[in-house]
Amino acid sequence: MRILKPHLRSTSIQCYLCLLLNSHFLTEAGIHVFILGCISAGLPKTEANWQFVIRDLEKIDNIIQSIHIDTTLYTESDAHPSCKVTAMKCFLLELRVISLEFKHHVLNETVENLIFLANDRLSSNGDITETGCKECEELEEKNIKEFLQSFVHIVQMFINTS
């Protein structure tokens, strides 16, 4: 399975150390490379953009229309901004249901990519504890079209606050 990781990078200090320790890199240029490498390793990584999550939601919507999936999923239709992380986690759990119930390669790959991107973005919020929010099972079950529309709305809440 190929997971797309747009805008993600990682820097390894070991590579720069290896280059520096080789005798022919003990020059002024080699030292500059080492210092710049150390500085870039300390910079925060660029995270996936919520726009890629919306793109994957649109792709899922197109796939669902083409293979005529008719299912109901727990859907948060009017999430309060203070409960957006909880709502997002519920949406991601319900996406796993789609992936497990429907054996469609492109659909499953897109769902997994979307889950990866959203979880990566959520991890930047740390361990936020939201109180007074509905549990996933307390949400109303709606058809998949309404589920995806509500999902886009939640993602837009994240975009508007970042």
UniProtKB/Swiss-Prot annotation:
Give the signal peptide as a residue range, or say none if absent.
Answer: 1-29
Q: List the disulfide bonds.
A: C83-C133, C90-C136
Which Pfam family, any one of them, does this sequence belong to? IL15
The record's annotation in Gene3D superfamilies points to: Interleukin-15/Interleukin-21 (1.20.1250.70)
Q: Which residues are glycosylated?
A: N108
Query: Where does the protein end up?
Result: Secreted
Q: Which GO terms describe its cellular component?
A: extracellular space
Q: Which residues form the propeptide?
A: 30-48
One MF annotation (Gene Ontology) recorded for this entry: cytokine activity
The role this protein plays is: Cytokine that plays a major role in the development of inflammatory and protective immune responses to microbial invaders and parasites by modulating immune cells of both the innate and adaptive immune systems. Stimulates the proliferation of natural killer cells, T-cells and B-cells and promotes the secretion of several cytokines. In monocytes, induces the production of IL8 and monocyte chemotactic protein 1/CCL2, two chemokines that attract neutrophils and monocytes respectively to sites of infection.
Q: Which PANTHER family did the record assign?
A: INTERLEUKIN-15, INTERLEUKIN-15-RELATED
Family under the similarity heading: Belongs to the IL-15/IL-21 family.
Q: What is this protein called?
A: Interleukin-15
State which gene encodes it: IL15
